[in-house]
């Protein structure tokens, strides 16, 4: 047999001299359901970075606002201003999103949207409709569960201008960042180690608990949010698409915002809105 010369050898044959077909199969090694490039430690780093950023930026925004815009105003009163809350929230989202990208692209040199399986789905309107259907279905639970009559979150809707700003966040940056962390980072790490069922459950659980302060630690409201998390994570698992779970989340929040705006005459009479769960 004539030896293969370097002049005639293809690049692939030099890089991979042994064909994959020659390698013996591994029947006892099933393919991983999820195999993200990042690890659980990376997810913990993102979580820690989020807490640190929340603490630092909220303080900076409050002191900056008192110095530049509201001189002499009590910090406790400033903390209740929706505009400042939204500003700090926007800055937190931007910082955390940048850190997420640095973890994926800087550490693993993989495109961010590919690594988290964004995979924008073709059936967008159906997923938005699924979110709306989920809202009407879960809304029935308020007749069987103890729901709070007054929540810290609803107080942010006291003025129409603030309500519209919050509604905008509720259908854009809010669900985007929550889906990126919970369904983009946390779920695939859990599913790889524990399987799909446990991955869905353990992703939805902290998703629900995270919203406890917004609803006065009422377990009925937290249970509803937990179920929203279950549905969104199940969609992510079934379609292998964070974009799909994002659309379901937007459909849920968006339907609720539209209904609330209609019932309250443009957020002017919030007492007619009923119970709001985002």
PLM region spans:
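Alpha-helix capping and helix-coil boundary motifs
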Residues: 71-74, 107-111, 123-126, 159, ...
């Amino acid at each position: 047999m004539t030896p293969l010369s370097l002049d005639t050898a293809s690049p692939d044959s030099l890089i991979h001299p042994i064909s994959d077909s020659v390698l013996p199969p591994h029947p006892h090694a099933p393919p991983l359901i999820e195999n993200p490039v990042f690890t659980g430690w990376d997810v913990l780093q993102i979580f820690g970075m989020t807490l640190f950023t929340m603490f630092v930026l909220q303080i900076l925004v409050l002191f900056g606002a008192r110095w530049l815009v509201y001189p002499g105003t009590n910090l406790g009163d400033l903390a209740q201003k929706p505009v400042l809350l939204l500003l700090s929230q926007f800055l937190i989202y931007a910082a955390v999103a940048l850190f997420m990208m640095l973890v994926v692209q800087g550490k693993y040199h993989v495109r961010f949207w590919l690594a988290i399986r964004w995979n924008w789905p073709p059936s967008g309107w159906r997923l938005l409709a699924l979110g709306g259907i989920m809202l009407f279905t879960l809304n029935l639970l308020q007749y069987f569960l103890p729901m709070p009559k007054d929540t810290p979150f609803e107080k942010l809707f006291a003025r129409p201008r603030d309500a519209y700003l919050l509604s905008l966040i509720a259908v854009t940056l809010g669900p985007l960042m929550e889906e990126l962390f919970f369904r983009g980072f946390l779920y695939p790490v859990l599913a790889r180690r524990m399987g799909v069922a446990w991955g869905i459950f353990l992703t939805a659980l902290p998703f629900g608990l995270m919203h406890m302060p917004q609803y006065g630690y009422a377990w009925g409201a937290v249970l509803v949010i937990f179920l929203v998390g279950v549905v969104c994570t199940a969609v992510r698992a079934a379609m292998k698409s964070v974009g799909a779970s994002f659309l379901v989340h937007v459909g849920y929040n968006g339907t609720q915002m539209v209904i609330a705006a209609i019932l309250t005459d443009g957020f002017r009479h919030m007492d007619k809105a009923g119970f709001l769960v985002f």
